[in-house]
Amino acid sequence: FTDVRLNLWLLDVASGKMTVVDNDAHNNLNTSGGAIESPRWSPDSRWLTYAKRLPGQMNAAFVYEVSTGRATQITDGMSDAVEPVFSRDGKYLFFAASTNVATNVGWLDMARLDKPVTRSLYAVVLNKDAASPFAPESDEEAVKAASDDASGEKKDDKKDDKKTEKKEDAGAKKETKIDFAGISQRIVALPVPDRAYAGLQTADGKLFYGEFIPNKPGFTLNTFEFKDRKSSVYAEGVSNYTLS
């Protein structure tokens, strides 16, 4: 949670201990009325990610390790990075970033009103050994293996084994491993055009994100499917949403 002094706090419910995670000291003119933006947990609850404003008035994405109490900046501050969120499998960190937000930093005049801010969507490959979500795909067709099932019993056994494996996978805790060395070289852009994006949330194999379109009520909720590497409209006229 945050307070009026722009601190982000972490409360251990079991012990009642409260820890200051970070402070958004350079965001004292935050028009949203809050401090550090959109803190989100990793799937294993070992990391917390958030965006905060830097001295140059650009936001950057950070991750905080609960066990060490150390916060690490992920983006370089040359673009305005906001709304970082972990993928459900803990392999990636997604965020939206803008390189034309500087014309909107000023707040005292109305000259910035006709300069809409656009953002691109990015994914950070957190583990150095993990594959990029947009690695080149092979165009070779898979060869169907010859079946050595002599009876229906073997097929049933295989089905039961697969069901057991799925249950075990579903119950297993997905560890989020972050290699900070060279992490800036593992940031890749999603193949979507620059738009006024906001409201990033993740589901299994998907990224949901809102798009503000001029002269339309609410925002358009889109979903990006990583398996197909395609985006599609999920709903229109959305005022708010959340994923369980």
Stretches found by the model and what they are:
Residues 1-15, 20-35, 46-62, 68, ...:
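A flexible loop/linker signature enriched in serine peptidases of the S9 family
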Residues 39-47, 83-92, 199-205, 240-244:
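Blade-terminus and WD-like Trp-Asp/Gly-His loop motifs, strongest in beta-propeller folds
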Residues 72-84, 188-198, 228-243:
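Conserved blade-ending motifs and adjacent loop-strand segments that build the rim/top face
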Residues 91-96, 225-228:
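C-terminal closing repeat unit and adjoining cap/tail of repeat-based domains
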Residues 131-134, 196-200:
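Short, solvent-exposed loop/turn elements at domain surfaces
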Residues 175-193:
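A short helix->beta-strand "capping" segment at the edge of beta-propeller domains
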Residues 199-244:
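Cationic-aromatic interfacial patches
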